[in-house]
From Swiss-Prot:
Superkingdom of origin organism: Bacteria
Family to which the UniProt record says this protein belongs: Belongs to the universal ribosomal protein uL6 family.
Presence of keyword RNA-binding: yes
Gene Ontology cellular component annotations, sorted alphabetically: cytosolic large ribosomal subunit
GO biological process per UniProt: cytoplasmic translation
Organism from which the protein derives: Pelobacter propionicus (strain DSM 2379 / NBRC 103807 / OttBd1)
Protein name: Large ribosomal subunit protein uL6
Keyword Transmembrane helix: no
Gene: rplF
InterPro entries, alphabetized: Ribosomal_uL6-like, Ribosomal_uL6-like_a/b-dom_sf, Ribosomal_uL6_a/b-dom, Ribosomal_uL6_bac-type, Ribosomal_uL6_CS
A Gene Ontology molecular function term of the record: rRNA binding
Function text: This protein binds to the 23S rRNA, and is important in its secondary structure. It is located near the subunit interface in the base of the L7/L12 stalk, and near the tRNA binding site of the peptidyltransferase center.
Amino acid sequence: MSRIGKLPIDISKDVKLAFSDSILSVQGPLGKLSRRIMPCVNLEITDSCIIVMRNDESGTARSAHGLTRTLVSNMVNGVTKGFQKSLEINGVGYRAEVKGSELVLSLGYSHPVVFTIPAGVTIEVDKLTKVVVKGFDKELVGETAAKIRSFRPPEPYKGKGVKYADETILRKAGKTGKK
């Protein structure tokens, strides 16, 4: 039995679940998410919890057991609490601002980088150097934050660039010069 897969998923009262034709739909106060569940895994939905069970003991069923439980748990948590990812911008003249449905980044290039904010995600900018990506779909929030970071990843010598708030940058020493 999978250590993660055997844990039940608690459901709050304001979450509505629908499971038919191997598609799970979860609706809550923040939004609605749907996901196809693998056929080797089955869901048992009660009033207060979801239990993920596998249909057989094959290798795919065992590996999908814990994965499916985590994905369903992320769906339930997303529509109730939501997810967020924080980014920091370091560098002289590096800044960000939200204009309508676009995030405009000044990252030391000759032109500003314009990023269109995807549907289902909100972006807040605090003090021009802190960007917070929020949403109810964990996968979309992480993907959006990774795209913003990829415009100027932090470099190891001065640490300039866009980094996650909880990320540590391994710093390198510069050239020592000729002796």
